[in-house]
Amino acid sequence: MAVCAFAANEAPGTKNHERAAEVYRPVAGKFPLSEQAKAYDGQLAFVDHANRRGSLRVTGGELMHRTPPVPFALLPYGMVRYHGAPADLRNVPLGTMLHGLFYLPPDPKLSSVPVVTQPSVTRPAENHALLLEDEPSFCLREGKVWKLKDVTMKGGTEGLLAAHREPKAGGEGKEAELTMRLDATTRFWRGREQLGLADLIAEGIWPADGKKSLDGQEVYLGIAWKPDGNWVRRTGNRMHVSDVWLDAKAMQHASRHQTEVHREMVRCRWMPAYVDAVEYGKFGDATVTATLFGGMDPSLYADFKKGIRGQFAASEFNLKHAYGSVTETLVANSGPITDVTKQEKEVPLGSSGIQIKIQVTQIIEGARPGRIIRIRPMNWPDDAVPREEYTEGHHDERFPSPDTMPKYGPIRLN
C-alpha cells in the first residue's frame, strides 16, 4: 500500500524550502555568528598564501593516507594562529595539524575554492575559514595543556609518547589518551634552548630504549601527521609530535617571535578593514568609517590614534591590494584620522571592535560600504608589495578560479 510522504496540510517541497531558509552564510560587510560555524580538524597539505587558500586533509576518515586533501579559503577577516600568536598561511609548515572554524561560501559564484555539493565527514561543505590554529594556539586559547604519561623509546631515534589533554586549571574536561609518534625530527624547547631526542637521552631525562613514566609532566605539543603504516599495518592515523615545549618560558618565547613575524608583515601590507559608512561631501571629499579586522597584535591597533594622518587603498576579498605601488595618489587616499572608538559590547570573532574615521579630499572608488580596504598610520612603511599580492585590476586575479586548486580522483584497487 502506498503512503503519502507529505502531511495532509503540508504542500510538497515545504520542508526543502524550510531547510534552505535555515542555511547560514556570512554576509559581506558583516562579521559572522561564531555559533553558526562548523568546527573540524585537518592536516595542512597545500597553501596558496597569496590568495589566502589551501587544502586540508580532514580527520575522521578510515585512513589518513587515503584521505584526499580538500580545498579551503580564508574569509577576509579569517584569522590564522601559529605558536599561540597571529600568523599568515605562509608561516605554517605543511603537515601541521590545524583546528578550524568554517562556514559555507558567502557567495558560491565567487568562491575561490570548489563548492561542495555532496558533503561527507572528510569533505565538508563548510570550507571558508574564520579561524585556523595549530595545537599550541588551540590549547592556549582554550586554557588546556598536555599531560605526558610515558614514553617508549627504540634505538634512541624514535618512540611513542602517551599523553592526554585537559584543562590547565584542572577539574572536569580530561580528554582521551593518545599515543603519538616522535623521532629525530622532533624538537624540544626548554626556555630559550632547542634540544633533540639525542640531547634528552644524553642528559638521562629519557631512555634510549624502553619505557619510562613521565608522571603527568605538563607541556604544550606541536602536532603534525606524516605517513606511518600501510593497509596491513594500520597505524596510519597516528599523529606525529613535531615540537614539545617543556615549560611556559619556552612557549612564550615561540609566541613572541611569531608575533614579531606577523606584526612586520601587517605593517608592510597594511591593516585590513571593512568600510562601514561613507559620508560624501560636495566636491569628492568624504569621511570614511571603517572597522579594523581582528586577530592582530595589540600594538598594531595602538598605532591608530585620533589626530594623526592615515592612508588607505582598495583591497579584495583575498586581501590583495588593487595595485602594487599603493601610495600613488590615484589609488590611495590620505587624510587625518578624526575619530577612533572601541566597541564596548561583545566583539564578534574576526573583528577588532575598533572603528576609525578618516577624512579625505578625493574618495576612491573602492571605498564603499561593505567593501574591504587596507589602511595604515603614516608612520607605517609604504613599500611596494610583491606582484603576487596585488591584482592590477585583472579579473582572474581579483576572483581566483576554483579550477586551479589541486584535484584528486578516486582510489583504484588493483
Regions found by a protein language model. Name each.
Residues A2-Y77, Y82-N414:
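Short, flexible, surface-exposed loop segments at domain boundaries
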